Amino acid sequence: MDLLFFDIGATLYGTDASQVLRIDRALPEDLTLAELGLPHRGNRAIVFDTPEGEAHLKVDAVHGVRSIPVNSLRRMPPTAGAAAYAVGVCLEEARTVLLIDLVETARTQGRH
């Protein structure tokens, strides 16, 4: 699976690269989600499509797309009580990276 890795604040996240339309400059009104942490600078935005149109998630850095073997991915168990946007984790080298669904992230903010 192709994942896009990015930072919000000091935390590394990943998302399904097929959800991403492009990376752009961030605008003041772009989406931030306190639960993911607040960006230090937030100069970049991940642009993605929702049923209502394009949405933008403000991020600090984009690390690029990497193909990750399916056996390195884990779905978030329903009993974890995680937010709807937290779809799983990726076992990336020595750390675990939270994988988020961009459309669900926008819905959480009531933007789409």
UniProtKB/Swiss-Prot annotation:
Gene behind the chain: frzB
The name this protein goes by in its record: Frizzy aggregation protein FrzB
GO biological process per UniProt: chemotaxis; signal transduction
Keywords, comma-separated and alphabetical: Chemotaxis, Transducer
SMART domains per record: CheW (SM00260)
Known function: Necessary for proper aggregation of cells to form fruiting bodies. FRZ genes define a system of signal transduction analogous to the enterobacterial chemotaxis systems.
Parts forming coiled coils: none
Listed transmembrane segments: none
